[in-house]
Curated annotation (Swiss-Prot):
GO terms for cellular component: glutamyl-tRNA(Gln) amidotransferase complex. The active site is at residues 78, 153, 177. It comes from Geotalea daltonii (strain DSM 22248 / JCM 15807 / FRC-32) (Geobacter daltonii). This is Glutamyl-tRNA(Gln) amidotransferase subunit A. It comes from the Bacteria. One of its GO terms (molecular function) is ATP binding. It catalyses: L-glutamyl-tRNA(Gln) + L-glutamine + ATP + H2O = L-glutaminyl-tRNA(Gln) + L-glutamate + ADP + phosphate + H(+). The keyword Metal-binding does not apply. Belongs to the amidase family. GatA subfamily.
Length: 485
């Protein structure tokens, strides 16, 4: 087995026993990136030289007995996290040459534990998309089928795990942007509860929805990564001051007596038959393990996508107002005046989907429409939140599909934004409710594409969904399947 194929916990054991060094593991990963990157395009920036220096430092730490679960582990980050001295583009022309002067909190926490950054990953521009086709740096391909999308917006984060180009990655999830690509690429992806992980230093898309989370090869790795980045941060006023549990201790493999809810609004006509089959098999697996099932209702699910595309675009139009060519980012050389510079820098710097969402959001916030659209959307959001609260009075976790279909072909939905938006129909409600959800590999379609299972927990119920996901993993082998690149 090559070093680049190992999980965090497998590589940690080898590093601890001094069977391998972090430099060797990092060299193996960099060679793997070089070999498969032309096919996948998961990275925007590869930080090879710095990675080898950091790996040498990690080896010193290990020799001195100062070792954490992540010391010497090669990781990669979605290019939405600010990284001191390393270009951060958010996959946009407007930030093509932006080099941040500081690290995001989650990046600083990984570095403090001795993780080795091998690069920054491709995504949809400003995290707006479900397919990683809108990046200024070119589309990313799904390692399971290079003609298919990896999902989005954290497509690079999932594709890099599927292609074994990083041991673990971090992404962000605003409406499904970790869980949907994890499902399409056969990885584990966790969207924590809003406020569980600091957003400081993460380029904002929709501030009341964005959340940082890991994409990994198995649930144990996911728990290790969440332990590392979770916790209160005074620099983010929305981060919650709660102790961080040892998530790995929750992985008991036991779900006997666990009450699992099946939301009737998620098992709808039109669900891809391969997805339905994977869900039926997952339910049967949980029954064999002693879990109990109950049908529940989340009646306002039908309004989730419309609500999301008002709230998220309104927040995006406000957040993206800061990109004007004045202090940082792309500045138009054609401008004749200050106003002209703002206009032309933004026109040249933003891609089509970003412009579409800025216009949608600006319209929703405009005078005379604020009450009709934005305010009404926030009220419906509250109803969606109450649906989850009521459901969790009856059950411990919810089980649903992640996406209505397996990965679709590149270019299939780019001409129809509404079709693209509907691919997040099962993930968006979790963001609107501010709770947590995880995607776990649960099957393959007849075409050989991965299908993910979504487990949704109560707010700050990450231990519950990690335990349930880990138990499923112990009784199936889907997480061990690898894309044949």
């Amino acid at each position: 087995m090559e070093l680049f194929e190992l999980t965090i916990h497998e590589l940690h054991d080898k590093l601890k026993k001094k069977e391998v060094s972090s430099v060797e593991a990092t060299e193996s990963m960099l060679a793997r990136i070089e070999a498969v990157e032309p096919k996948v395009n998961a990275f925007i920036t590869v930080t090879a030289d710095q990675a080898l220096k950091d790996a040498a430092e990690a080896d010193k730490r290990i020799a001195d007995g100062d070792m954490d679960k992540l010391t010497g582990i090669p990781v990669a980050l979605k290019d939405i996290f600010l990284t001191k001295g390393v270009r951060t583009t958010c996959a946009s022309r407007i930030l093509e040459n932006f080099i941040p002067p500081y690290d995001a909190t989650s990046v600083a926490r990984l570095k403090a534990r001795g993780a080795v950054l091998v690069g920054k990953l491709n995504q949809d521009e400003f995290a707006m998309g479900s397919s990683t086709e809108s990046s200024y740096f070119g589309k990313t391909s799904n390692p399971w089928n290079l003609e298919c999308i990896p999902g989005g917006s954290s497509g690079g984060s999932a594709a890099a795990i599927a292609a074994q180009q990083a041991t673990a990655t971090l992404g962000t999830d605003t409406g499904g942007s970790i869980r949907q690509p994890a499902s399409h690429c056969g990885c584990v992806g966790l969207k924590p509860t809003y406020g569980r992980v600091s957003r400081y230093g993460v380029i904002a898309y929709a501030s009341s929805l964005d959340q940082v989370g890991p994409v990994t090869r198995d649930v144990t790795d996911c728990a290790i990564m969440l332990e590392a980045v979770a916790g209160y941060d005074a620099k983010d006023s929305t981060s919650v001051d709660l102790p961080v549990p040892e998530y790995t201790k929750a992985l008991t493999g036991q779900v006997k007596g666990l009450k699992i809810g099946l939301p009737r609004e998620y098992f709808i006509e039109g669900l891809d038959p391969d997805v339905q089959k994977a869900m039926d098999e997952a339910i049967a697996t949980y029954r064999q393990m002693g879990a109990e099932f109950q049908e529940v209702s989340l009646p306002h699910t039908d309004y989730a996508v419309a609500t999301y595309y008002l709230v998220a675009t309104a927040e995006a139009s406000s957040n993206l107002a800061r990109y004007d060519g004045a202090r940082f980012g792309h500045r138009s050389h054609e401008a004749q005046s200050l106003l002209d510079m703002y206009r032309k820098s933004r026109a040249e710097g933003f891609g089509e989907e970003v412009k579409r969402r800025i216009m949608l959001g600006t319209y929703a916030l405009s005078s005379g429409y604020y009450d009709a659209y934005y305010l009404k959307a926030q009220k419906v959001r509250t109803l969606i939140m109450h649906d989850f609260i009521k459901a969790f009075e009856q059950v411990d976790v919810l089980l649903t599909p992640v996406a209505p279909t397996p990965a679709f072909r590149i270019g299939e939905k780019t001409s129809d934004p509404l079709q693209m938006y509907l691919s997040d129909i099962f993930t968006i409600p979790v963001n609107l409710a501010g709770t947590c959800g995880i995607s776990v590999p649960a099957g393959l379609s007849r075409a050989g594409l991965p299908i993910g299972l979504q487990l949704i927990g109560k707010p700050f119920g990450e231990e519950n969904i990690l335990r349930a996901a880990h138990a499923f993993e112990q009784n199936t082998d889907w997480h061990k399947r690898r894309a044949a690149l």
